Amino acid sequence: MTPDDIAALPYRKCVGVVLWDGAGRVFTGQRYDSELPAWQMPQGGIEDGEDARTAALRELVEETGVAVEKVEVLAETPDWIKYDLPPEIVPRIWKGRYKGQAQRWVLMKFLGSDADINIETKHPEFSEWRWLEPASVLDSIVPFKRDVYEQVFDAFSDWL
């Protein structure tokens, strides 16, 4: 794909979940499909008919096994936060249909215990998980998502 081809592509609408433990740490998972260190917070596409909150709760269950009764939704980013994929991976991800993602992020307080987290879901996203402070998350993610995560942590700084 040429740079002009990539520039003409749309962004994929997506949600992200900041699952906060109430003690300054957030859930972070190592991507199952990556051989390199690629830690991230739960995220996924918004399906037809879903709003960001509904999609975020669905993604939470799908990726972490955490039941919706074990969280309290606290906040949502007011605007879409966008990121571009590195050009060399655009053709490989989402069949080359998107240049990146436009995300709405939802902050949830985790009300359960670690035993309520089960990443061995029907379609696993993560091979392992841990609680990390936001600064450590920024050190653990792929570089092209760093700016997004900084904006998200800033948006939720009253809690984190």
Curated annotation (Swiss-Prot):
Gene3D superfamilies recorded: Nucleoside Triphosphate Pyrophosphohydrolase
Enzyme Commission code(s) on record: 3.6.1.-
PANTHER family attached to this UniProt entry: NUDIX HYDROLASE 26, CHLOROPLASTIC, UDP/ADP-SUGAR PYROPHOSPHATASE
Cofactors required: a divalent metal cation
Family, per entry: Belongs to the Nudix hydrolase family. RppH subfamily.
SUPFAM superfamilies (UniProt xref): Nudix (SSF55811)
Biological role stated in the UniProt entry: Accelerates the degradation of transcripts by removing pyrophosphate from the 5'-end of triphosphorylated RNA, leading to a more labile monophosphorylated state that can stimulate subsequent ribonuclease cleavage.
Pfam families the UniProt entry points to: NUDIX
GO terms of biological process kind: nucleoside phosphate metabolic process; ribose phosphate metabolic process
Family matches, as CDD domains: NUDIX_Ap4A_hydrolase_plant_like
GO function term, MF aspect, one: guanosine-3',5'-bis(diphosphate) 3'-diphosphatase activity
Record bears the keyword Manganese: no
Keywords carried by this UniProt record: Hydrolase
Motif Nudix box, chain ranges: 44-65
Protein name from the UniProt record: RNA pyrophosphohydrolase
All copies of domain Nudix hydrolase, residue ranges: 10-154
InterPro entries associated with the record: Nudix_hydrolase, NUDIX_hydrolase-like_dom_sf, NUDIX_hydrolase_CS, NUDIX_hydrolase_dom, RppH
Coiled coil: none
Gene name for this UniProt entry: rppH
